[in-house]
């Protein structure tokens, strides 16, 4: 029996995933709804992390703290071992989360009114963060090729030429789970360099390589253009630690670092909570065996979902290269998004994410989180099937 086969009760724990569905979906009562929507896992974090946090809690004093040298070194070691990426400790800046890091990058490295480029369908904060900070969002959608979303570099260059100042890259891609290859990444860098555009690379899903694919950090292949890149990463998605709220930016350019440090201080994010250093260090030094067991478990869940759901006429399932999020294509059914979401909630008692949350390019798709026990996945599949059995 796998450690991931256990089902842990999460209702009534102030879990966004389990306890906020009434608010998110506009329901009076969601007690019978199975949540397979937001991207956190239903698995316990590595035992080493829990033990380290418990030991820290037993100290009983929770004063101001800072990121330990051991924790910083664990980041360097993790990136070297996991991604063959060699970074300097001095390049690391800490933040309360990757979304907060994205916001700090926008505020520190662009000016109000500047244009920020994104490539939808993509993670919703890519739309919201620049706009809420007074920047203009320019969209250059990915295009479909052989059932996958890819870059249209002719359109991408045309967009960059519109006086764009920053590009936000999702690497690996969310929601599609694509692992961008070296040629794609190098072309992104080349074109951004041509138009003097900085690149903010969200790489929070980097460790979640499902079927043996290799994550390529953008900065690793950027060559002489490395200083135009800020890489945003965290252990939180990898080890199910979102509530700990710790992330880091890797910034090789000293001028950008100083600007980001100033914004960190100005926004009151100069220090992390006292558990952040402990959790990060334990995860990166002792969490690898847990992760290595997790990835094939998620892969098996994905294979099961694809096999079962594609028995429904008009449903196509894309298994991602990365993440634990499945992208479901229902466009052949000719159903409106509102209708299929209502059916899923009312008939299937199942909460998934609508594709348009990731931009209009996501219309006709659903996102399903399969980072849960196989029994829960089977339950979710049966609920999905029930919707189309009537």
Regions found by a protein language model. Give the residues of each.
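Conserved PLP-binding active-site segment in aminotransferase class I/II-type PLP enzymes
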Residues: 1-18, 29-32
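Conserved N-terminal alpha-helix of the aminotransferase class I/II PLP-enzyme fold
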Residues: 63-96
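A glycine-/small-polar-enriched, mobile loop at the entrance of the PLP active site in fold-type I
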Residues: 35-40, 54-72
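PLP-dependent class I/II
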Residues: 2-3, 28-34, 40-54, 86-88, ...
């Amino acid at each position: 029996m796998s450690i991931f086969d256990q089902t842990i009760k999460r209702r009534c724990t102030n879990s966004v995933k389990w306890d906020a569905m009434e608010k998110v979906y506009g329901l009076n009562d969601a007690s019978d709804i199975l949540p397979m929507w937001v991207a956190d896992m239903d698995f316990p974090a590595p035992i080493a992390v829990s033990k380290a946090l418990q030991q820290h809690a037993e100290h009983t004093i929770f004063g101001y703290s800072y990121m330990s040298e051991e924790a910083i070194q664990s980041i360097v070691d993790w990136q070297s071992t996991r991604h063959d990426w060699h970074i300097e400790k001095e390049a690391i800046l800490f933040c309360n989360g990757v979304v907060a890091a994205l916001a700090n990058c926008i505020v520190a490295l662009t000016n109000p009114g500047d244009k920020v480029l994104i490539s939808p369908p993509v993670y919703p904060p890519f739309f919201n963060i620049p706009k809420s900070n007074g920047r203009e969002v320019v969209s250059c959608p990915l295009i479909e090729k052989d059932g996958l979303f890819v870059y249209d570099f002719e359109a991408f260059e045309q967009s960059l030429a519109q006086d764009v100042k920053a590009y936000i890259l999702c690497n690996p891609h969310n929601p599609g789970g694509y692992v961008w290859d070296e040629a794609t990444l190098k072309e992104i860098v080349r074109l951004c360099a041509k138009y003097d555009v900085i690149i903010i690379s969200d790489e929070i899903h980097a460790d979640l390589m499902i079927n043996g694919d290799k994550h390529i950090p953008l900065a690793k292949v950027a060559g002489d253009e490395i200083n135009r890149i800020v890489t945003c990463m965290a252990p939180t998605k990898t080890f199910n630690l979102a509530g700990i709220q710790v992330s880091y930016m890797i910034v090789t350019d000293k001028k950008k670092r100083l600007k980001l440090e100033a914004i960190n201080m100005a926004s009151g994010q100069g220090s992390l909570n006292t558990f952040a250093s402990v959790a990060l260090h334990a995860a990166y030094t002792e969490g690898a065996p847990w992760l290595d067991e997790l990835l094939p478990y998620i892969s098996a869940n994905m294979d099961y979902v694809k096999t079962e759901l594609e028995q429904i006429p008009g449903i196509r399932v894309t298994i991602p290269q990365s993440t634990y999020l499945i992208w479901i294509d229902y466009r052949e059914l000719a159903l409106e998004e509102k209708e299929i979401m209502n059916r899923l909630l009312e008939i299937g008692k199942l909460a998934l994410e609508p594709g348009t949350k990731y931009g209009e390019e996501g219309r006709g798709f659903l996102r399903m989180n399969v980072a849960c026990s196989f029994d829960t996945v089977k339950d979710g599949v049966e609920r999905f099937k029930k919707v189309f059995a009537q």
